[in-house]
Design a protein with these regions (language model features):
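Surface-exposed acidic, glycine/proline-enriched linker/cap segments
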Residues: 172, 192-204
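Short beta-strand motif preference
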Residues: 98, 121, 137-139, 282-284
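Canonical Radical SAM [4Fe-4S] cluster-binding loop centered on the CxxxCxxC motif
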Residues: 125-181, 185, 195
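Conserved AdoMet/S-adenosylmethionine-binding subsite of the radical SAM
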Residues: 180-183, 200-394, 398
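Auxiliary Fe-S-binding modules of radical SAM enzymes
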Residues: 1-119, 125, 133, 180-191, ...
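Residue-level structural signal for beta-strand termini and adjacent loop
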Residues: 123-124, 233
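Short linear Ser/Thr-Pro motifs
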Residues: 88-90, 140-141, 257, 285
């Protein structure tokens, strides 16, 4: 799992639960108890980060630590500035991608880029069964990604650094208290959204294209990065997002998507077994059901082959009527054959299918077919509708529940697998080449 950066050593209120914040106030000799808890609730209710006792230094010589949130130090709460927005349309409404700037990690080779790097998040409209629109917020857990999936834009960047829990929660904070608040006519939010930027008129126009009556109802960890490569910060961020004094999102409305890091799955499963975490959503990016094909497009498979991944999924704690989601990015000429449809069905069916190589029980899972969204310089096109329909029909015929993910935001590089900029990869390579000794 990724090493912890120095930016995690002193947390901010955005990266703490209410009880952790109250403990920090008490340790610092600040107003604690009910006063601190009410202050915490007010921050997440109003979006105001300028109140008293939101940042203070430790009175002791002990070094503050994220692992000990009761330490008496809090960094100033800062929500990363939104630098750009991109708008596209879908049948359910406007899709808005926003880019925030965060500090680069000290000593990183990306020093040539300046003091900041960028993360991307997407506000995605969803129409429920009753016709009510809500928004799903797709958040990033890292800047770039180390997993190397060949079909993914973010993977082409390489890993720049992981995000802290506060930076992850900050994406939700920016979406709710800046973008959506500006959509509803909040002048202070509009000022935060466009502060000092020449594109201010365009950004306001984008924000106002959203539905002012809609709220963020779901959060998916499907943006930049591999969540289980940063699992402790992701777990902490979920703890904050579900805190009843904070954002108060039901844990059942949060989904973590992973390429299948077996060690990270085991760590997350231990937390899901605890009360209050039982209904956390899990999505596994499988994309091929044989080791040869999956290893070609997903290097993680060389470390954790399909059999190991499936064994860990059999151990995943599932409560009530919940199920996990098997994600399958359908790539023309790579994993779209009839045999591929049968193989991914057998991965779910396990020993209940006579043709399955997996003897274990049937997974409590559905297959989510995702038509490939081409990255920059992609060697593959998007699949045709006919190909998607044929592939899904073959899975359905095997008795496995299958759904298609509707494509949203492809034209603005906001769809699944399209987040990130290759400029970072190019400049990182240039920096490495400049530092390498010449023959």
């Amino acid at each position: 799992m990724s090493e912890r950066s120095d930016i995690f050593l002193t947390p901010s209120i955005l990266g703490l639960t209410a009880r952790q914040y109250e403990a920090a106030c008490k340790a610092a000799g600040r107003s604690a108890g009910r006063v601190a808890l009410d202050r915490y609730a007010a921050v997440f209710r109003s979006g105001d980060l300028t109140g008293p006792d939101l940042a203070f230094a430790s009175p002791s010589s002990a070094s503050p630590s994220f692992a000990s949130p009761s330490s008496a130090s809090l960094a100033p709460p800062v929500v990363a500035s939104i630098r750009r927005t991109h708008l596209s349309q879908s049948p359910e409404g406007a899709v808005l991608k926003f880019t925030q700037s965060v500090p680069r990690r000290a000593g990183d080779a990306l020093a040539v880029l300046g003091d900041e790097v960028e993360i991307e998040s997407v506000i995605i409209p969803m129409i429920g069964r009753r016709g009510v629109r809500t928004y799903t917020l797709c958040v990033s857990s890292q800047v770039g990604c180390a997993m190397g999936c060949t079909f993914c834009q973010t993977a082409q960047m390489g890993l720049i650094r992981s995000l802290s829990a506060a930076e992850i929660v900050g994406q939700f904070f920016a979406a709710r208290h800046t973008v959506l608040a500006a959509c509803r006519g909040d002048e202070r939010a509009a000022a935060r959204l466009t502060a000092g930027l020449p594109e201010r008129a365009v950004m306001l126009e984008h924000a106002r294209a959203l539905d002012p009556a809609a709220e963020i109802g779901n959060i998916v960890f499907m943006g930049m990065g591999e969540p289980l490569d940063n699992v402790e910060q992701v777990i902490q961020a979920i703890s904050v997002l579900t805190d009843h004094r904070g954002p108060c999102l039901p844990v059942s409305r949060i989904t973590v998507s992973t390429v299948g890091r077996v060690d990270g799955l085991a760590r997350l499963a231990a937390r899901v077994a605890e009360p209050g975490w039982h209904r956390l959503g899990l999505a596994i990016s499988v994309n091929a059901a044989d080791d040869a094909t999956r290893g070609t497009i997903m290097p993680i498979n060389r470390r954790y082959p399909m059999a190991d991944l499936r064994t860990q999924l059999e151990r995943w704690p599932i409560f009530g009527g919940a199920h996990m989601c098997i994600e399958y990015v359908l790539i023309p000429g790579v994993n779209d054959r009839d045999d591929d449809a049968r193989a991914i069905s057998d991965f779910v069916l396990g020993g209940t299918s006579p043709t399955s190589p997996y003897p274990g029980p049937m997974l409590r899972a559905m297959i989510n077919v995702i038509p490939y969204n081409p990255r920059e310089n992609s060697p593959w096109p998007a699949p045709t509708q006919e190909t998607v329909d044929r592939f899904m029909a073959l899975i359905k015929a095997r008795g496995v529940f299958v759904k298609r993910r509707r494509t949203k935001g492809r034209d603005t590089m906001a769809a699944c697998g399209q987040l990130g900029s290759l400029a970072y990869a190019r400049k990182k390579r240039s920096a490495a080449e400049a530092e390498s000794p010449r023959a």
